[in-house]
């Protein structure tokens, strides 16, 4: 009876296994079939994980860096210039590091999806440098485990482990609060 059931489902199981194997070993665009690429100049760095990109056509795109969650930077009242929501340790530094890497520079983004705030969730490339991974490796952000998918998941987790062991950036703190937990405690949207 079991052998008959296995024979019946063998083609389905075989195809499922092949799909899984291809998913693990295919390039990014094959794994994320909706991946689109855009190029432009980084016109603004909002914080350690969000930028604005202006394409050569003049289109302005809001980009959320995929795979990382940077500490929250302070939020300022535009009229008064005063802080109306506090930031986290390394929040400002994470933004400053991202500014030094890409502000005013031409980058390519691989858009993997759209988040609930209508930002394009993307991998940001400066030449052959994966800026997202660099931010995690330097301890300026944690790997955003809740949203990581194969095949990139392993790279981001490895980069975070390297930063933790070396006590870089956020991992040098004696007490660290995840940005997602901080946002909940401060009622800040992500």
For the regions a language model picked out, list residue spans one by one.
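Hydrophobic membrane-insertion alpha-helices, especially the h-region
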Residues: 11-24
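N-terminal targeting pre-sequences for secretion and organelle import
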Residues: 147-190
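N-terminal Lys/Arg-rich, disordered targeting/topogenic segments
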Residues: 1-10
